[in-house]
Amino acid sequence: MSGKVHGGKGKSGAKDSGSLKSQSHSARAGLQFPVGRVKRYLKRNAAGRTRVGSKAAIYLTAVLEYLTAEVLELAGNAAKDLKVKRITPRHLQLAIRGDDELDSLIRATIASGGVLPHINKALLLKVEKKHK
């Protein structure tokens, strides 16, 4: 074997390991949602002796963060259209049901969400123009 010893200062070039600041899994992945908590939930709810990889937790956390940002953006737009500054369950309902992909993904009933305004065309009065 060669005379090189594995290990050393690490990427930062610090002399002692005490000066390194520990980073969370979320910070390393560049996410806001907690990767460690998602991994813990995955391990707890995994069937039987199923093992959970760390990248699975990171990927799932990124998906959850993206979906949350998407719903909040659409709900914020709905609130802005109604000229209010607070997002309510009604705005969430309008945002989710207004987007086809989110509507098919989230089939849950939103409490205090109301219903979408819709009138069937058959119920509308027909205005016929008289031809001369």
UniProtKB/Swiss-Prot annotation:
Q: Which UniProt keywords apply?
A: Acetylation, Activator, Chromatin regulator, Chromosome, DNA-binding, Nucleosome core, Nucleus, Transcription, Transcription regulation
**UniProt-annotated stretches for the region Disordered:** 1-30
How does it get modified post-translation?
Answer: Acetylated by ESA1 and/or GCN5 to form H2A.ZK3Ac, H2A.ZK8Ac, H2A.ZK10Ac and H2A.ZK14Ac once deposited into chromatin. Acetylation is required for function at telomeres. H2A.ZK14Ac is acetylated at the promoters of active genes.
Q: Which CDD domains match?
A: HFD_H2A
Q: Which residues form the signal peptide?
A: none
Q: Which InterPro entries match?
A: Histone-fold, Histone_H2A, Histone_H2A/H2B/H3, Histone_H2A_C, Histone_H2A_CS
Chain coiled-coil ranges: none
Q: Which GO terms describe its biological process?
A: chromatin organization
* UniProt modified residues of type N6-acetyllysine: K4, K9, K11, K15
- Gene Ontology molecular function, alphabetical: DNA binding; protein heterodimerization activity; structural constituent of chromatin
Recorded hits in SMART domains, A to Z, give: H2A
Q: Where in the cell is it found?
A: Nucleus; Chromosome
Q: What does this protein do?
A: Variant histone H2A which can replace H2A in some nucleosomes. Nucleosomes wrap and compact DNA into chromatin, limiting DNA accessibility to the cellular machineries which require DNA as a template. Histones thereby play a central role in transcription regulation, DNA repair, DNA replication and chromosomal stability. DNA accessibility is regulated via a complex set of post-translational modifications of histones, also called histone code, and nucleosome remodeling.
Protein family (similarity comment): Belongs to the histone H2A family.
How is this protein named in the record? Histone H2A.Z
Q: Which gene encodes it?
A: HTZ1
